[in-house]
UniProtKB/Swiss-Prot annotation:
A motif (Shuffled ATG8-binding motif 3) lies at residues 308-311. This is CDK5 regulatory subunit-associated protein 3. GO terms for cellular component: centrosome; cytoplasm; endomembrane system; endoplasmic reticulum membrane; microtubule; nucleus; protein-containing complex. Coiled coil: none annotated.
Amino acid sequence: MQDHQHVPIDIQTSKLLDWLVDRRHCNLKWQSLVLTIREKINTAIQDMPESQEIAQLLSGSYIHYFHCLRIVDLLKGTEASTKNIFGRYSSQRMKDWQEIISLYEKDNTYLVELSSLLVRNVNYEIPSLKKQIAKCQQLQQDYSRKEEEGQAGAAEMREQFYHSCKQYGITGDNVRRELLALVKDLPSQLAEIGAGAQSLGEAIDLYQACVEFVCDSPTEQVLPMLRYVQPKGNSTVYEWRTGTEPSVVERPQLEDPPEQVQEDEIDWGDFGLEAVSDSGNIISAETPGIDWGISLESESKDAGADKIDWGDNAVASEITVLETGTEAPEGVARGSDALTLLEYPETRNQFIDELMELEIFLSQRAVEMSEEADILSVSQFQLAPAILQGQTKEKMLSLVSTLQHLIGQLTSLDLQHLFMILASPRYVDRVTELLQQKLKQSQLLALKKDLMVEKQQEALQEQAALEPKLDLLLEKTRELQKLIEADISKRYNGRPVNLMGTSV
C-alpha cells in the first residue's frame, strides 16, 4: 500500500476558499477581520524608519502577512535599542506590527487572505490584462490593415486624378484655368482638319459623277459643305451663310476663372440685393435670371403680351435672346457667326455627316470593284464617265483611310471635351469639380492613413505599458501560489500540495 504521506493534495484554485473553510483552517467571517488588519497596516506605514528594503516593500504592492514578517525582522535591527531585559520592545512601531501579525495568525486569517488574492488574480486580474493586451494587438492589426487600405486608396484616387487630367491634356495644377487654355488651341487644330479636308476634291468629284451616272440625269451638287471647304477651308459661319468674307470678326470671349475664395471667408454670392434703408426694412429682390417661384400677372388683359414666361421654356427663351443678340451690322461676324464651321455645332455635325456619307460611298465602291470580275458589272460601267472607269480598288481604300482619319480626329474624346467647354462654361465647372473631388478623396484617404498610423502607435504604447504589469502580476501570483502550497503542506505533515487551474 502506498504511503499516504507522499500522496499529493490537489486543490482546485477556484474552490480554494471553500476548501479552507470546509476543513476549518479559517473562520467563515474572515473578511471583517481582514478589514481591521488593513486599517492597522495603513496606520502603521505612516511611521516607518528610513530603510531602502522597507521602502521597496511598501511601494506599490499589496502588503500581506509575509511582508509584515519581513518588516518585523527589519525593525528588530532598527529598533534594537528599545529592547528591554525581558526581550520585549518598547517601540510603538514594533508593537504595532507585532499586533498586526498576531491578528493575521488568529484563525489563520493570513492564509485565507492570500488565497483570496490568488483567486482574484487568477480569475480576474490576469485575464483582464491579457484581454486588454489582446485587444491592443487586434487594434494594431486593424489599424495596419486600414493604413494599407488608405494608402492604396489614396494612390488609386491620385492615379485616377492624373489619368483623367492626362485624358484632358492638362497637368492638374489649376484644372479650370488649364481647361480654358486648351480651347485657345482649338482653332489651330480645327484649321489643320479643314486643311486635310481640302484634299478630298477628287473623292467629291467621283461621288458626284457616280450619282449623275446612276440617276441618268443632272442632279444638284452633293456634299455642299465639303465642296465649299475645298477652296475656303475652315472659314467662319458668316462667310458660309452669306457667301462674303466678314470685314470684322468679334469672337465670343471665354470667361476668366474666378478668384479662389479664402478658406476663412464666406462666399455669400452676389444676389443683387439692395441695401436696407434706415427708414424701412424693405429689401429689393429684383435679381435678373433667378426664378423666385412667384407668378407676376398684370391686371390689364392688354398686358398679356408683355408677360414673362418662367416655365420650362426658360432655356429656349434664353437661347433665343442670345441668338437675337448676335445681330450685327453688315460685314461684322458676331456671336455664332464669328465661329468657324467646325466650332459651331450645327455646321460641324453637317461636316461630319458629309464625311461619313463620302466614306460609305467609297467603301462600298471598293467592295464593288473587288467583285467586278463578272461580265455584267463590266458592261454596266462601259458607258460611265472616265473618272469612274479610271479608279482602282487601292485608290478607293486610300481615300477611305483619309476620310476615317478626319472623322476620327473630329470625334475624338479630346476634341469632344473641347467642344463642350467651348459650348458651355458650366461644363468646365463640372469637370473641375469632378477632378477636384478625386483629388480631395485622395487627400482624405492620406489623412486617414496618417490617423491609422497614429492610432497604431497609441495601441502599441498601451500594449507596452500593460505587458510589464502583466509580468509583475504573474510573478507575484506564482509567489502567492508557492507560499500557500507551502503553508498548507505544513498542516498536513509535509504532504505535497498542488493548486490546480492557476495557469501561471
